[in-house]
Each structure stands twice: as C-alpha cells, then as structure tokens.
C-alpha cells in the first residue's frame, strides 16, 4: 500500500437547515405617547423639553434663489414666455417672472432685501431671525444674548408682550440673504477682474450700501464704485521709465488725456492747455488721472481697517497701487505716519528707486517740467536729510 504524500483535509460538514416558524416577533411594551397615528403634529405644540434653539434649528425654509418653472403662464412684467416663479415663503410667492425681469424682481422682493436688527440697529446682516409673535427681526447675537434669556425668564416677548412658552408660542423663522444685491453701474471686463476681484469680495462680505458709504466718507463716497483698471493685455511688455514718460510728453502725436479737469494741470511748470499724454495704449486717461481715480476709490472703501480682516483698530489703512506694464494690483498698506487718504503707488514709474513709494501729492508737488515739456526725474528724488526730517516730525506729532 503506497503512502500518500499529501495530507487529506477534513471535509466540511453541511449545515442542517432549521425549520422555519411562522410565529411573529415578540411584542415590546411601549409607553403611550398620546399621539394618534396618522395625525400631523404641529411644531408649535411640541413639549417644553425642546428648547427654542432646537425648534429654531428645525425650521427649514426654501432658498429664494431657486426658481421653479411657471408652466404656460407668461411673465407679469413683460408678458413674455417662458416664465419662472420665485420660490419663497412670503405672500407674493409663485409669481411668474421671466429671466430678463428676474434681477429687478429679486432686488425689489422683500425676501431678498437686507434686514435690519431692531435691537442693535445693524444694517445689512446676512442672517436674521423673524419672531413669530410680532414679526420683529433680530440678528443672531441679539437673539442669544438679549431676547432669548429674557423670554425664558419672563415668559413673554420683550417687544409685543406675547407668551413665548408652551403651546401659545409661535415658532420663529430664519431669513438668510445668501446673495445680497450689489448695484453694479458698469460691468467689469474679464481682463480687469484680477484687479478688482478682491475689492469686490470685501464689499460683498461687508455689504456696504451706498448710503452707508456716504455716511462714513462724505459726499465723495458716491463718486466711484469700482477702481479704474489698466487693461493688462494692451500694455507694452517692458517697464515704463522716466525716459519713456519724458518722450511721451514731448511727442505731440500721442493721444492726450480726455478728462476736462486733468490731474496734470496742478503740476508746477505745466504748460497751459497742454493735456498729459496717455502712456498706456487703449486708455483715454493719463497716468495721473488713473492714480487720482484710484485715490477716490480707496478713500471710499477703506477707513481704519473697516474693509480688511485682521486689521488693528489703531492706525489708518490705505491701499498701495502698483502700476506696471503687466498688471495693476491693490494691496493694503499700514501708513499710520503718513497723511490721511494718501495714495501710495510703487516706484515703477522710474528706474532709480523701484522700491520707493511715491504719493499723489509727490507727483503734483515735486514733479517739474522743463520748457520743452520734458519730465525732470531729479525732482522726485528727495534728499536723505529731508526724508529723515519729515519722518522725525511725523513721529513727534503722533507722540503729542
């Protein structure tokens, strides 16, 4: 008998199927909740163990930006089709509106307007809570710090006196303005979005209205909505130096500034009736007018770090406008020791001091023009002693 070289494995046993039983599962005793099956339970009659904040979080509303199809009905404004309907929870919902009339309808619709807190008076809050008893609107901070503790202690609303506990309480509503309306007077071309994209994001984040800008910065706040941008794709692929500027002023064939009140008229030595040349192709303003337009925009958008995040309260923040032949970038710069609302732009205008910052007042006060219309580059170069003297005087004024 030959021995097997392989070990025989044990055979698997086949499981024996258990007989199935038709007995139902054992019943579990449950306490009576007092709720009839099939009956809808309203949120206003929930037990008191659920707090107002949980009840507030449980309330869900539709997004007003989502629009549903209006079917065969036409637009009520222009009588055209196809029409859509605003999807919100107000009384004027389900109104057929076409795509052309949607921006104006959304702007005038009450569900899309920025709410105002009745407690602290904050204007333009993103999310507010509308009380179910009196309809007053409160921001999140005032709701949790002021209204909610008092309503739990007294049991009544502090604005209308209605009961806020038990079955008499009406649930609140959360109103969110996901996309506030930002008035845009002129559309921004695609080639200029890299210049003002950050500015527009900060404006949308802070949601400053035109009236708020005017109240903060005066009448000049409504002069300009967006900064004047230099089209980067039209610029020459080289740095603009002092020699290029002087040649441009001497060349009468180049296009001149089209503004009636040109900023170059205030420069000492300027010839009467002689408009400044346009250094960048494709523009209708000279370089000084571009910087002045930037100054108006910077003045109306920045005040003691109001726009920019993580900015200290002390000190004045303005913007540094970098002008070069490829792009125009705007960045925040702390210039506490410099004049208020002074526009600084990097010294790319010349090749002597590319790291130096020149103000608009330096251009209008220090630039000198020769009899032939040539620019004197030495007029911008401030002596070292004078610069140290100005710095010391600025520090002494701040200390007092």
UniProtKB/Swiss-Prot annotation:
Chain intervals for the UniProt region annotation (Disordered): 9-33
Domain of life: Viruses
GO MF annotation terms: zinc ion binding
Alphabetically ordered keywords of this record: Metal-binding, Zinc, Zinc-finger
Annotated protein name in UniProt: Putative zinc-binding protein ORF78
Gene this chain is encoded by: ORF78
């Amino acid at each position: 008998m030959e021995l097997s070289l392989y070990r025989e494995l044990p055979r698997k046993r086949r499981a024996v199927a258990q007989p199935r039983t038709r007995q139902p599962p054992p019943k579990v005793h449950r306490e009576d909740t007092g709720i009839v099956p099939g009956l809808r339970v309203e949120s206003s009659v929930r037990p008191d163990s659920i707090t107002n904040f949980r009840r507030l979080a449980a309330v869900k509303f539709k997004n007003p930006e989502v629009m549903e199809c209006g079917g065969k009905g036409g637009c009520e404004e222009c009588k055209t089709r196809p029409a859509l309907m605003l999807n919100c929870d107000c009384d004027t919902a389900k109104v057929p509106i076409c795509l052309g009339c949607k921006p104006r309808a959304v702007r005038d619709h009450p569900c899309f307007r920025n709410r105002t807190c009745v407690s602290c008076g904050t204007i333009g809050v993103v999310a507010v809570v509308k009380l179910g008893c009196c309809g007053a609107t409160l921001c999140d901070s005032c709701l949790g710090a002021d209204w909610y503790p008092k309503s739990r202690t007294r049991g009544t609303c502090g604005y209308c006196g209605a009961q806020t506990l038990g079955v008499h309480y009406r649930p609140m509503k959360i109103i969110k303005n996901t996309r506030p309306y930002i008035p845009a007077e002129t559309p921004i071309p695609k080639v200029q979005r890299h210049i003002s994209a950050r500015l527009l994001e900060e404006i949308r984040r802070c949601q400053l209205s035109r009236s708020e800008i005017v109240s903060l910065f005066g009448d000049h706040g409504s002069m300009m909505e967006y900064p004047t941008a230099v089209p980067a794709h039209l610029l020459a692929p080289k740095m603009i130096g002092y020699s290029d500027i002087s040649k441009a002023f001497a060349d009468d064939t180049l296009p001149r500034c089209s503004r009636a009140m040109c900023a170059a008229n205030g420069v000492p030595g300027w010839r009467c009736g002689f408009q400044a040349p346009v250094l960048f192709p494709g523009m209708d303003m000279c370089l000084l007018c571009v910087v002045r337009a930037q100054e108006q925009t910077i003045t109306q958008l920045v005040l003691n770090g109001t726009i920019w995040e993580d900015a200290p309260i002390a000190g004045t923040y303005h913007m540094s406008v970098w002008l070069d032949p490829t792009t125009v970038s705007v960045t925040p710069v702390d210039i506490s020791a410099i004049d208020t609302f002074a526009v600084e732009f990097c010294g790319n205008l010349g090749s002597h001091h590319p790291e130096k910052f020149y103000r608009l007042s330096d251009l209008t006060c220090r630039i000198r023009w020769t009899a032939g219309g040539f620019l004197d580059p030495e007029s911008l170069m401030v002596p070292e002693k004078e610069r140290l003297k100005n710095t010391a005087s600025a520090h002494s004024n701040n200390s007092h």
